[in-house]
Amino acid sequence: MTRRRLLHAGTLAGVAALLPAAALAAPSQCGPWPLWSAFVDKHIQRDGRVVDFLNPDQRSTSEGQSYALFFALVNNDQVLFDKVLSWTRHNLCGGRPDLNLPAWLWGRDGSGAWRVLDANTASDGELWIAYALLEAGRLWSRPGFLKAGQQMLQLIRTQEVATLPGLGPMLLPGRTGFVDNGRWTLNPSYLPIQVLRRCANADPKGPWAAIAANSARVLRDSAPVGFAPDWTVWDGKTFNADPKRGNVGSYDAIRVYLWAGMLDAGEPLRARLLQDLSGPADLLAAQQTPAEKIDTARGVGTGALPVGFSAALLPYLSALGKPALLKAQAQRVPAATQPAAAALPYFERTLALFGQGWLENRYRFAADGRLLPAWRTPACAATT
């Protein structure tokens, strides 16, 4: 499968937490979220379909649907959550989410018909959908969502989890196409530790705790100079460059730093993981700019750094305690009301939603993976 290739006031307010001398007024994390509202207006149709306009097929993906579910939950919008979930179930799961994992790609085919374009699965989208369902069930007291989240975890266990020799239980990127003659292709960005922790809590007899521990090894050993690759291949003993894609870290790998930066301080894997992924921070400290594409074996980049990548690095730089670097990257990301923000493509907008939203304290992850949305805090509850 091939896949894919805001904010000054809000983000700088988050930066102020690391910059005590900065005279920056913090906006209320309880108030309207302009960046999310703009995303909804542009990318989410009334029926709940999330559209990526960058591609001619005007595609929708399980990833896009999963992120929309997550941010609808962060924004406490049950109506939108229900619409996005309904579209996902009917169009990606064939109307039977209890039996079918969602197809990863839906859009317009060459004849102009709208349909599933690739029935293979993508475990990153499914993991986030399961997470959103579990947390929506808990936070909104909707037991049907808890059951649906459990059902999806069971489907993922059955179809996308394998025990790799020399490594142990691992989440494969999808149902088919990632195992070839004793070699397993993995995507490090599909392994957010906090999401796996929540899965382990919801399914304690499942493989999720082991996958989380093994994921730390994937992230460490596939990043020999501190840069995560988009894809890596395990041969039973070592991690190797993907033969088709090479040692490249780009639009997938940027999320590895994002997920690591958002880990709770109580996560036992956090400190070592941030150390293992020091590449982008080291480049910035050397007054160099991380690039669009990084040769992960040499730490050498090509292409201008996309704005969304800067947004994704915000939690990471915050976690590393790098206030000057954090401020510099925050200043690259346009405010939600600026034309430059409106011009950002779908994927960069999602990175900005994750990075900016976290820095603005609109949500956090607990050490056990639970979502801690701002709207559940006493301060926000008092404003409603």
From Swiss-Prot:
GO terms for cellular component: extracellular region. The active site is at E63, D124. It catalyses: Endohydrolysis of (1->4)-beta-D-glucosidic linkages in cellulose, lichenin and cereal beta-D-glucans. One of its GO terms (biological process) is cellulose catabolic process. Gene3D superfamilies: 1.50.10.10. Disulfide bonds: none annotated. It is found in: Secreted. The keyword Secreted applies. It is an enzyme of class 3 (hydrolase). One of its GO terms (molecular function) is cellulase activity. Its main location: secreted. InterPro entries: 6-hairpin_glycosidase_sf, 6hp_glycosidase-like_sf, Glyco_hydro_8. Pfam families: Glyco_hydro_8. Residues 1-25 form the signal peptide. Belongs to the glycosyl hydrolase 8 (cellulase D) family. Hydrolyzes carboxymethylcellulose. This is Endoglucanase. The lineage of its organism: Bacteria, Pseudomonadati, Pseudomonadota, Gammaproteobacteria, Lysobacterales.
